[in-house]
């Protein structure tokens, strides 16, 4: 039979920290908060605007005709989506202009 040797002075590989001292972590978000705010706003609009349009028009504008109310609600969903895409393109163009100005200043 073999016996296990117990030595308290030996260190295993788990006892060594190979990385050294920890560096401060960068916890800032990768996406600017303005972009997140716009996304959340358009998400809220995408949920509430078509549903609100449907119920408003089915009860007061079209007097119970759900077909026209549903069509108008679908149109409003597309309006919100197109508005978000246009705003995203504008934000991207602004970022590209800022980067171009920074590169011109470096030269």
From Swiss-Prot:
Keyword Endoplasmic reticulum applies: yes
Lumenal-facing ranges: 63-68
Cytoplasmic topological domain residue ranges: 1-41, 90-107
Motif (Prevents secretion from ER): 104-107
Topology in membrane: Multi-pass membrane protein
Superkingdom as given in the UniProt entry: Eukaryota
N-terminal signal peptide: none
Name of a matching Pfam family: VMA21
Region Disordered: start-end pairs: 1-30
Keywords: Cytoplasmic vesicle, Endoplasmic reticulum, Membrane, Transmembrane, Transmembrane helix
Transmembrane segments: 42-62, 69-89
GO terms for biological process, alphabetical: vacuolar proton-transporting V-type ATPase complex assembly
Gene Ontology CC entries for this record: endoplasmic reticulum membrane; endoplasmic reticulum-Golgi intermediate compartment membrane; ER to Golgi transport vesicle membrane
Keyword Transmembrane: yes
Location of the protein in the cell: Endoplasmic reticulum membrane; Endoplasmic reticulum-Golgi intermediate compartment membrane; Cytoplasmic vesicle, COPII-coated vesicle membrane
InterPro entries registered for this protein in UniProt: Vma21
Compositional bias (Polar residues): 1-11
PANTHER family assigned: VACUOLAR ATPASE ASSEMBLY INTEGRAL MEMBRANE PROTEIN VMA21
Function: Required for the assembly of the V0 complex of the vacuolar ATPase (V-ATPase) in the endoplasmic reticulum.
HAMAP family cross-referenced by the UniProt entry: VMA21
Similarity comment: Belongs to the VMA21 family.
The name this protein goes by in its record: Vacuolar ATPase assembly integral membrane protein vma21
Source organism per UniProt: Pyrenophora tritici-repentis (strain Pt-1C-BFP) (Wheat tan spot fungus)
């Amino acid at each position: 039979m073999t016996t296990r040797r117990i030595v308290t002075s030996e260190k295993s590989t788990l006892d060594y920290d190979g990385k050294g001292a920890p560096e401060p972590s960068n916890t800032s978000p990768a996406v600017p908060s303005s972009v997140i705010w716009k996304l959340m706003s358009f998400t809220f609009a995408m949920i509430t605007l078509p549903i609100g349009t449907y119920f408003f028009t089915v009860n007061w504008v079209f007097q119970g005709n759900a077909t026209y109310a549903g069509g108008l609600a679908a149109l409003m969903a597309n309006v919100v989506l197109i508005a978000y895409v246009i705003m995203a393109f504008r934000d991207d163009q602004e970022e590209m202009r800022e980067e171009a100005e920074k590169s011109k200043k470096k030269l």
